[in-house]
Amino acid sequence: MNPALGNQTDVAGLFLANSSEALERAMRCCTQASVVTDDGFAEGGPDERSLYIMRVVQIAVMCVLSLTVVFGIFFLGCNLLIKSEGMINFLVKDRRPSKEVEAVVVGPY
């Protein structure tokens, strides 16, 4: 029997025997708590400086996105206002004043 094949079946048997333990081992192997630093001590998580930098970057990104949305709405509103004024002027040019309006304007003079 091939020893490598026997080893593979043993590993597969361990994973299939108790899947919750295998899942826990897999989760523990890939967390930040399992990372070992050069000093040999396990690092508990990100340090305070990197958390501060991440928070500042998040705030900067949110400010840029907020300004983009605000200016987008502003310029969209201005564009619609300009178009509506143009449409009103277009309708006013096509409209002819009635003769009654002229009679009222000319009457008092």
Curated annotation (Swiss-Prot):
First-listed, main subcellular location of the protein, grouped into a coarse class: cytoplasm
Membrane topology: Single-pass membrane protein
Entry's Gene Ontology cellular component terms: cytoplasm; membrane
Keywords (A to Z) from UniProt: Cytoplasm, Glycoprotein, Membrane, Phosphoprotein, Transmembrane, Transmembrane helix
Positions of transmembrane segments: 56-76
Subcellular location: Cytoplasm; Membrane
Glycosylation sites: 7, 18
GO terms classed as biological process: regulation of mitotic cell cycle
PTM-bearing positions, type Phosphoserine: 98
InterPro entries per record: Reprimo_fam
The family this protein is said to belong to: Belongs to the reprimo family.
Function text: May be involved in the regulation of p53-dependent G2 arrest of the cell cycle. Seems to induce cell cycle arrest by inhibiting CDK1 activity and nuclear translocation of the CDC2 cyclin B1 complex.
Protein's UniProt name: Protein reprimo
